[in-house]
Amino acid sequence: MSDPFSEAQHQLDALGLRCPEPVMMVRKSVRKMAQGETLLIIADDPATTRDIPSFCEFMDHKLLASQTDSTPYQYLIQKGL
């Protein structure tokens, strides 16, 4: 089985940042992307386990994969409309 995180077109390192900085950085990064492109987010703030999925739902992006069992957490999102 292939690693979905290795297929990301863009990457955002949010290690060491605390809420609300990771989501603010995700929003800024996604704005620069084309529809359908993917972003890998690497973070260690426990709040991202709640904030990243909520951000995706609210902004109509797809959360393609997540790894939140241990740090660093990883999220793969696809830009929506």
Curated annotation (Swiss-Prot):
Entry GO terms, CC: cytoplasm
Q: What role does it play?
A: Sulfur carrier protein which probably makes part of a sulfur-relay system.
Highest taxon of the lineage: Bacteria
**GO BP, one example?**
tRNA wobble position uridine thiolation
**Alphabetical list of PANTHER family matching this protein:** SULFUR CARRIER PROTEIN TUSA (PTHR33279:SF2), SULFUR CARRIER PROTEIN YEDF-RELATED (PTHR33279)
Q: Which GO terms describe its molecular function?
A: sulfur carrier activity
Sorted UniProt keywords: Cytoplasm
Q: What is this protein called?
A: Sulfur carrier protein TusA
Record-stated family: Belongs to the sulfur carrier protein TusA family.
What's the main place this protein lives? cytoplasm
Q: Which InterPro entries match?
A: Sulphur_carrier_TusA, TusA-like, TusA-like_sf
Q: Where is the active site?
A: C19 (cysteine persulfide intermediate)
User: Where's it found, cell-wise?
Assistant: Cytoplasm
